[in-house]
Structures are given as C-alpha cells and as structure tokens.
C-alpha cells in the first residue's frame, strides 16, 4: 500500500489554484494501516468499529489527522427485532476478508463471530434503540477522538434508504 501511495504521488495532477492539494484519507482498521494513514495521509475512515476502536485509532493516528468513524444505527426499541435486522445487515462481514481479524483485535471472540453473531458483537457494532441511545453512541465515538461520525442507518420495512430514521435522528445529531 505504501508503494501504491508513492505511485499515486508520482502522477502529475494539477487541480488548479482553487484546490492546490487534494486531501487523502485512507480506509483503515488495524494498526499497520492506521500508522500508514498517520504517515502518508490526512486521516482515516474506519468501518464496523466500536468507540474503543476509535480511541485506539486516535492514539495511533495522533491529534493532527482526521478520524472518521462509521456507526451503523437502527431506530428500534425492541431488542429482538433490532438484533434480527442488525444481523441481516452485518453478519456477512464476519467471514469477509479483513473484518474478522479487525473484530478480533477489537476484543470480539470466535464465538462472537460464529453464525450470525452473538448479541455482544451485534450490540457492539450497531447502535439501536431510540434517538437518545443512538446519539449517545455517536457521542462515545466523538469522546474517543473521532472528528466525524458517519452514521449508516439500517433500513427497516419499506424504507430502503432509511430516510425516516435520518429525519428522526438529524435534530439530535446535527
């Protein structure tokens, strides 16, 4: 990846005087990529992480780099329904490439990753409940060092873009 970034830097690109330099933000989950983001980028974007991961990333990244954390959210006060929907949207990551090592590094176990995931991993990765509970999780990421929290509302029912959830969450998050 370091070599690839060097190749990108070697390509002449002149966006003009209004934008003399385009910022670079890397997707990063584990320490080596976070260190690369610190050394060769303006920041990082994490995905499928807990606030504890955000705190670790901030410690590695340092104070002067952008840290954007993703947080899946689901407006549902029913634990069984919330976890069912969350599992539908997240469990496939538990067997996908670099996510299992990242999740293990965050403290989740093979038992948490088994099947469609334990309640512990689902609750750790998806903020569900009412507006206050979800806003609380977003605040946890901010307190852990995130500059920005990218919420990913999980769709329910016929609202495939989760627009209603965004409408309800916006006043508490903006």
Each model region followed by its residue ranges:
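Active-site-adjacent structural elements that line small-molecule/cofactor binding pockets in enzymes
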Residues: 1-174
């Amino acid at each position: 990846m370091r070599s690839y970034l060097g190749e990108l830097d070697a390509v002449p690109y002149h966006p003009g005087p209004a934008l003399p330099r385009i910022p670079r933000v890397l997707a990063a989950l584990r320490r080596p990529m976070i260190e690369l983001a610190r050394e060769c980028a303006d920041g990082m974007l994490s995905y499928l992480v807990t606030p504890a991961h955000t705190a670790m990333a901030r410690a590695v990244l340092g104070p002067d780099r952008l840290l954007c954390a993703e947080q899946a959210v689901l407006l549902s006060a029913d634990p069984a329904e919330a976890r069912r929907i969350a599992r539908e949207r997240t469990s496939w990551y538990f067997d996908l490439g670099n996510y299992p090592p990242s999740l293990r590094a965050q403290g989740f176990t093979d038992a948490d990753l088994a099947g469609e995931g334990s309640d512990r991993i689902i609750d750790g990765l998806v903020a569900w409940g009412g507006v206050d509970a979800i806003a609380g999780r977003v605040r946890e990421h901010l307190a852990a060092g995130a500059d920005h929290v990218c919420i990913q509302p999980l769709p329910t029912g016929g609202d495939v873009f989760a627009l209603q959830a965004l409408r309800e969450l916006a006043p508490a998050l903006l």
